């Protein structure tokens, strides 16, 4: 599955206003659509990540960043053949309760 290393946030530092996490998504990874209650900034370090935002697909590449506003239907995936390494910054901090996944069958 996806590697998640939270540096700042509810688990790492009990911070509720902001979370910062380093992530590595393996080839073929995806998660269910979600409608989060937080803004999420993604900063790509290497590889590519596919993001579906309200039905439109965007591919984020190394060195690029993207903001997805809270309340927007979004799905993150890595359908590519290489790992996707990135940083995720959520405001307020990420929580399993506030991500609102449509079908939480993945971890």
Predicted region positions:
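Histidine-centered metal-chelating micro-motifs
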Residues: 30-31, 50, 66, 70-76
């Amino acid at each position: 599955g996806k590697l998640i290393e939270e540096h700042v946030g509810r688990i790492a530092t009990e911070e509720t206003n902001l979370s910062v996490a380093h992530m590595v998504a393996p080839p073929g990874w995806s998660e269910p659509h979600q409608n989060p209650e937080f803004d999420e900034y993604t900063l790509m370090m290497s590889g590519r990540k596919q993001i579906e935002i309200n039905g439109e697909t965007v591919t984020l590449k190394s060195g690029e960043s993207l903001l997805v506003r809270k309340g927007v239907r979004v799905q993150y995936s890595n359908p590519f053949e290489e790992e996707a390494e990135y940083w995720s910054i959520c405001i307020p901090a990420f929580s399993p309760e506030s991500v609102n996944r449509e079908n939480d069958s993945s971890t």
